[in-house]
Amino acid sequence: MDTRIYEVAGQLVIKGKGILAADESTPSCNKRFLAVGVEQTEEMRRQWRELLLTMPGIAEFLSGVILYDETIRQQTDQGIPFAKLLEEKSIIPGVKVDEGTGDFEGHPGEKITKGLEGLASRLKEYRAMGAKFTKWRAVIAIGENIPTQDLIEKNAEILAEYAEVSQDEGFVPIVEPEVLLEGNHTIEKAEEVTTNTLRAVFAALHEKRVDLKGLILKSSMVLSGKDCLQQADAKQVAAATVRTFQNSVPQEVAGIVFLSGGQSPQQATENLNEIVKLVRQPADWPLTFSFSRALQEPVLQIWRGDSAKIKAAQQAFLKRLKLNAAALSGTYAKDME
């Protein structure tokens, strides 16, 4: 295995910076565009990603950016490939390599992630395009009689196989088992499912002999279900999240990054701030953010496909990055919004 992956993993979770998730699939991106009246075309998606990636000063707050297959093939107006643009800013380009979810046979309401077939050859192509790390997402829904242990173990196995192939090809794998926010479950239920899921993932990684020092975990925060009547506050979220990690994540892991998973931008930042404050310093693992919607939503609301609004939209992006950087040092406050 290429030992340079340790260096890349360390740079991705460097203190004070986060990772932008700009890897929404075409259908996901189109859905967001539709909501704000932006034309759903490849060119508009390219313009949107260009707005984010060309923002002046971005490198102060971002260590890496996760791209999508379409995006890593795109260029700026000046003809610079996005991956090269990031490299020039000393930001590490990565790529999401899973191919979405499909039904898990015999398990209604549960999904497994596709994309292992042909993965090694896709990775060779991405490496030639400049990518240095990969990401793969599994989804775990909480509902009546779900998740099943079968589903958790199957997704853990698939994540481990993906991680093994990634490291063999010289990439740092980001493994993302997302426990979904949808549902009316309590925070206690979310903690139980997240702990169980992470233990299964690390057992599968151990079995595949994946090197945890060259791997990053992308995790959900432990939250009450969206429709739960009793919503946990940020301090409760932090306590449940940190406890979950202490009970399930080996210390060798290079770092943990958080997904925002449908939280509002403010909620995600506030919860991150409380988690950082609670974690023992020096922490067992470096912690940072890897948000998508929680960074992009306010920016998209301003831009709405209008090139005259690019500067104002970039200012909103810069503001969210600054607020999350404050959260990484535990100094965020609501009145900074």
What are these regions (language model features)?
Residues 1-129, 142, 230, 234, ...:
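Alpha/beta catalytic barrel-like cores
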Residues 41, 136, 175, 217, ...:
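Conserved, mostly hydrophobic/aromatic
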Residues 65, 134, 173-174, 215, ...:
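Hydrophobic residues within beta-strands of alpha/beta enzymes
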Residues 99, 140, 179, 221-223:
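Short, histidine-centered active-site or binding-site loop motifs used for metal coordination
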Residues 119-204:
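Helix-rich catalytic cores of soluble enzyme domains
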Residues 180, 256-259:
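Short glycine-rich or small-residue beta-strand-to-loop segments that form or flank ligand, phosphate
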